[in-house]
Regions:
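Helical segment within the ABC ATPase nucleotide-binding domain
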Residues: 176-189
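Conserved ABC ATPase "signature" region
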Residues: 4-12, 103, 107, 114-132
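Conserved ABC ATPase signature
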Residues: 95, 136-140
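Hydrophobic anchor residue at the start of the ABC signature
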Residues: 150
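Catalytic Walker B motif of ABC-type/P-loop ATPase nucleotide-binding domains
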Residues: 161-164
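A short, proline-enriched helix->beta-strand linker immediately N-terminal to the Walker B motif
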Residues: 155-159
Length: 213
């Protein structure tokens, strides 16, 4: 819009709409159990691509498949097979404890109480959550929250885990701890990892293949 009050009024009455292609000409495949880095500058369409792969956004053209499932047609079915962590957005209810959040996620994914409790116990031990699993999320440090975010996304044993800037804002020691936990999940549960990050350490230490957009 034009500068000043006049420009603001003019833009409100006669808005100018400019069409921008967020993602165009992107084509790739990911192998089962692979740890892949999907990187590029800000505005390249990394997060938009993840949102299309997970069914949050629908592409205007082309074809998207995750494990043979079209996210635009069977998003609910796909949700049971994938997990997502957006480093700059929270999926946990901050007034609840991690434990209560995990139980809620277990119910969302139709796990029995026994299955949920067993999975919480397994992941809490693996991710070292015992000291703060009963503390409201709003009182946790950023590193503790990220660990809990990852655990929440793994409650239902997804086959694919989408990680969008999972270590953003973390100090070097906590970053390495989170990376090791991600490596462990890939190694032990054969979880496919689709990672976006501006942190070279994430890319070098986690992924064997890189796609640049």
């Amino acid at each position: 819009k034009e500068k000043g009050m006049r420009g603001s009024i003019k833009a409100f009455i006669h808005p100018r709409i400019e069409e921008i292609q967020a993602v165009n000409g992107v084509s790739f495949s990911v192998e089962e159990g692979e740890m892949l880095a999907f990187i590029g500058p800000n505005g390249a369409g990394k997060s938009t691509t993840i949102k299309m792969l997970t069914g949050i956004l629908y592409p205007d053209g082309g074809r998207v498949e995750v494990m043979g499932i079209d996210p635009t047609k069977k998003r609910r079915q796909l949700a049971y097979e994938i997990g997502t962590v957006f480093g700059q957005k929270e999926q946990l209810w901050t007034h609840l404890t991690p434990y209560d959040n995990f139980r809620f996620f277990g119910a969302i994914y139709d796990l029995s109480e026994e299955e949920t409790e067993a999975r919480i116990g397994e992941l809490a031990e693996r991710f070292g959550l015992a000291a703060f699993i009963d503390t409201p999320v709003r009182n946790l440090s950023l590193g503790q929250r990220i660990r809990c975010e990852i655990v929440a996304s793994l409650i239902h044993k997804p086959k694919v885990l989408f990680l969008d800037e999972p270590t953003i804002g973390l100090d070097p020691v906590v970053k390495e701890n989170v990376r090791e936990l991600i490596r462990q999940m890939n190694r032990e549960e054969h979880t496919t990892i689709f990672l976006t990050s501006h942190d070279v350490g994430d890319i070098e230490k986690l992924c064997r293949r890189i796609i640049i957009v």
